[in-house]
Regions:
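Conserved N-terminal structural module of periplasmic/extracytoplasmic solute-binding proteins
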Residues: 1-23, 39, 82, 223, ...
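Extracytoplasmic/periplasmic substrate-recognition and gating elements
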Residues: 56, 77-78, 167, 206-272
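Extracytoplasmic/periplasmic solute-binding protein
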Residues: 53, 57-61, 66, 91-143, ...
Length: 371
């Protein structure tokens, strides 16, 4: 929110990480274009998030594969011999950690707030295996948060959190979690796992003497017998459209160096941004897991997800309140997960209708809604 507010001053600086809640139709008013997307796609990946009308306004700092940071030693001591591939198997693994070790099975990082928003990153590719879901399926689909009954889709993601909290498989008091402190805690075996992007792995490894104990597993959802992992950009470098030409040129050169020469993405355990660059060892557990990159929205609908998302006030990937509410309701027991998503679906449907979208059943991977 701070940087979005500062953008209104025009003289905020030369380079920033583009706010994720900036609407696509605002990009050209704030940032220069790096060039046309078709040309840039030849050398760089994960450009869809800040591409608009054929131009690219943000170059990713690194790419994230969405999974779970975990302590391998804790899982081993708990008797978890195979990484869980479904929500049921994951909750069972957390229960084993609780029963057989002194570690906190799943650390929510509730108090930090922004960390809770990480859960939104799993409802697309990880939960559906569908590159069209986030920019088409959820936009046009009917009741996208409903329980599919097969442990897939957005409901399955959020229900993992709900069940972990309600079954007391998290810290005793989520309001007292400590983001900086949790890094050392997972490093030394006091925490079993945390739901965070691959960007977090290196931080956990460097927080103590047990770097080799830190691993990264695919998110435990299986769609038609196969696991998927959402892959997307971390913060993207944007260059101020209001800066003078010399500063814009210098900024462009600096972003090029950061992307192509600095080794930043590899050092952070991220997906490389340059086509053909080497993947880091931390993603070894993703061998056989298909990475899913969201397709761009259909032409003419580039702003539609953002508009519905804002109108619904759910604010996926923009706010953490809806995810924190899951924890609060699970703790108090005053609402089931089904009741929570009923409210979300109603708000989403109302927002769809506000923007002249008639929701219809959507099948993952189909790319179309039912007639």
């Amino acid at each position: 929110e701070d940087i979005k507010l500062r953008l209104t001053t025009d003289d905020w600086g030369d380079i920033c990480g583009i706010p994720t809640n900036l609407q696509k139709n605002e990009l050209e008013d704030e940032f220069i274009s790096y060039g046309d997307k078709e040309t840039l796609d030849e050398n760089y990946v994960l450009l869809n998030n800040f591409a608009y009308n054929g131009n690219v306004y943000g170059i990713p700092s690194t790419g994230n594969a969405q999974g779970i940071v975990y302590n391998k030693k804790v899982f081993e001591e708990a008797g978890v011999t195979e990484l869980p591939k479904t929500p049921t198997e994951f909750i069972e693994a957390l229960q084993k950690i609780k029963d057989n070790t002194d570690a906190i099975p799943l650390y929510t990082n509730f108090a930090a707030g922004w960390t809770m928003g990480a859960w939104d990153a799993y409802i697309g590719g990880c939960a559906t295996g569908d590159p069209d879901f986030m920019n088409y399926g959820i936009v046009h689909g009917e009741n996208p948060f409903a329980d599919n009954g097969d442990e897939t889709g957005p409901f399955a993601v959020y229900n993992i959190l709900y069940q972990a909290v309600s079954q007391e498989l998290v810290e005793d008091d989520p309001t007292t979690t400590d983001w900086e402190g949790c890094k050392g805690m997972i490093n030394n075996g006091q925490i079993g796992c945390m739901v965070l992007g691959s960007w977090a792995v290196v931080q956990m490894q460097e927080a103590g003497d047990n770097a080799d104990d830190i691993g990264y597993m695919p998110f435990p959802i299986t769609v038609d017998g196969k696991q998927y992992a959402s892959a997307g950009p971390d913060y993207c470098y944007g260059i101020n459209v209001h800066s003078d030409y010399d500063n814009q040129l210098a900024s462009m050169i600096y972003v090029k160096w950061l992307t192509e020469e600095s080794n930043f993405s590899y050092d952070q355990g991220g997906i490389p941004i340059c086509v053909g660059d080497e993947y880091p060892e931390v993603l070894a557990a993703f061998d056989g897991v298909e990475l899913v990159v969201d397709n761009p929205a259909p032409e003419g609908e580039e702003d539609l997800f953002g508009e519905i998302n804002t109108e619904s006030e759910i604010a996926l990937n923009n706010d953490n309140t809806h995810v924190q509410n899951i924890v609060e309701h699970a703790l108090s027991g005053d609402m089931t997960m089904e009741e929570i998503v009923d409210e979300w679906n109603q708000a989403w449907t109302d927002a769809q209708e506000e923007y002249d979208v008639t929701p219809a059943p959507y099948v993952y991977g189909s790319g179309v809604v039912a007639e």
